[in-house]
Amino acid sequence: MASREDELRNCVVCGDQATGYHFNALTCEGCKGFFRRTVSKSIGPTCPFAGSCEVSKTQRRHCPACRLQKCLDAGMRKDMILSAEALALRRAKQAQRRAQQTPVQLSKEQEELIRTLLGAHTRHMGTMFEQFVQFRPPAHLFIHHQPLPTLAPVLPLVTHFADINTFMVLQVIKFTKDLPVFRSLPIEDQISLLKGAAVEICHIVLNTTFCLQTQNFLCGPLRYTIEDGARVGFQVEFLELLFHFHGTLRKLQLQEPEYVLLAAMALFSPDRPGVTQRDEIDQLQEEMALTLQSYIKGQQRRPRDRFLYAKLLGLLAELRSINEAYGYQIQHIQGLSAMMPLLQEICS
């Protein structure tokens, strides 16, 4: 004998096991499909026995008219049935949601690319910012205002700035030379790509030190503020643009593979002046971009981050404008370009 609980789980039309509420009534899959198909027809079924047929799990197919009437009596509503177009649209959206929720698997080639980039980054830029303290910084740059003991005299801020920027560019050059795909390019193209991207890569990697709370760069025991940039001689308008860029990028909470892939996209830009192998470099940039897309999709991020890749493309374009403005600033700060011949060559 069926219990009351079992009855509550049974289809209210035929008594089979219910799968849920369909069109406003607790029914099985069979009665759900029957109701959708039947009410969509222009002519309804008729009963040859004056509407007195039994509708049960074993008898439900014998009389469509009585089955339909029992569906209606149980509360199933015609107005809740979607049109074919609406149903197709809903299924497409459901499939899209499932695809978004399913982590994207990186190919073996993409995994190897990320390993190569991370390895080069670790070897040449992993501890780069902690080494700034070696370049005799002024006392006010120390977070706790306690400079490390040094035998060498402390240099002016502008000299310290020139030294750390030259050091960063040298490390970026070592990073790129550690990438087999970069070394495979003609030397002329290597130079053109480096001249175009070195400053951009510096800022992409430097972003990992940017503190959103204080709006400063924290590099080991040192802290660099927007006021320090102004003391060196940079225009306030440029510095505000630069710090806004770093704040926007830092808020995206990128992971290390995303930073290095973003740097690689900046490096392999086929539209840099002087590039000859544009098609090959364009293909390399596309490889970096697709790997970054796949990595982002595979991270199961929060819904608000679903436009992360598009945001990064926008920031790359913004960074290029900053790069051009930076070159102009370097050339017009008195005495600075003479202290940074390598950077002057890159920005020329």
From Swiss-Prot:
Modified-residue entries (Phosphothreonine), positions: 38
DNA-binding region: 8-83
Zinc finger (NR C4-type) stretch: 11-31, 47-71
Keyword set, alphabetical order: Activator, Cytoplasm, Cytoskeleton, DNA-binding, Metal-binding, Nucleus, Phosphoprotein, Receptor, Transcription, Transcription regulation, Zinc, Zinc-finger
Annotated Gene3D superfamilies: Erythroid Transcription Factor GATA-1, subunit A, Retinoid X Receptor
Protein localization: Nucleus; Cytoplasm; Cytoplasm, Cytoskeleton
Reported modifications of this chain: Phosphorylated at Thr-38 by PKC, dephosphorylation of Thr-38 is required for nuclear translocation and activation.
SUPFAM superfamilies the UniProt entry points to: Glucocorticoid receptor-like (DNA-binding domain) (SSF57716), Nuclear receptor ligand-binding domain (SSF48508)
PANTHER family documented for this protein: NUCLEAR HORMONE RECEPTOR, NUCLEAR RECEPTOR SUBFAMILY 1 GROUP I MEMBER 3
Notes on the domains: Composed by a short N-terminal domain followed by the DNA binding, hinge, and ligand binding/dimerization domains.
Name this protein carries in UniProt: Nuclear receptor subfamily 1 group I member 3
Organism taxonomic ancestry: Eukaryota, Metazoa, Chordata, Craniata, Vertebrata
Gene assigned in the entry: NR1I3
